[in-house]
Amino acid sequence: MAKKIVGYIKLQIPAGGANPAPPVGPALGQKGVNIMEFCKQFNAKTQPQAGMIIPVVITVFSDKSFTFVTKTPPASILLIKEAKLQKGSSEPNRNKVGKVTKEQVRKIAELKMPDLNANTVEAAERMVEGTARSMGITIEG
């Protein structure tokens, strides 16, 4: 018989940087999950992506065991990295803070493809371009 699912926990944690402090500890503690075990597994799995923020969906079962699935980093984080910025614009309509090329947008779209509900890379590119516009980043090319 399959284990009964108690709940899902969605978090965004820096790769290789999960620790029992908030937000990880309280979120997992409420469901009775072994926090240190999750931290060890997550850090081991995300070590190669150090410096990125990784969304993770943790499935908690009735016997307090868990599984987790890591997603690709948010498009906004990838855009900031490509444009070599600290953060997006506070007024995206007025001040533009950076530029990315069509090739960079395509690279991000291809990386994000498994997590987006887009059927084609072109549709994924348009989603990434929309994120860039809302952050005050212009697309060249």
Curated annotation (Swiss-Prot):
Protein function: Forms part of the ribosomal stalk which helps the ribosome interact with GTP-bound translation factors.
Protein name per Swiss-Prot or TrEMBL: Large ribosomal subunit protein uL11
Post-translational modification: One or more lysine residues are methylated.
GO terms for MF: large ribosomal subunit rRNA binding; structural constituent of ribosome
Lineage: Bacteria, Pseudomonadati, Chlorobiota, Chlorobiia, Chlorobiales
Record keywords, A-Z: Methylation, Ribonucleoprotein, Ribosomal protein, RNA-binding, rRNA-binding
Gene expressing this chain: rplK
Superkingdom assignment: Bacteria
UniProt cross-references to PANTHER family, sorted A to Z: 60S RIBOSOMAL PROTEIN L12, LARGE RIBOSOMAL SUBUNIT PROTEIN UL11M
Xref: HAMAP family: Ribosomal_uL11
One GO process term, biological-process aspect: translation
Entry keyword annotation includes Ribosomal protein: yes
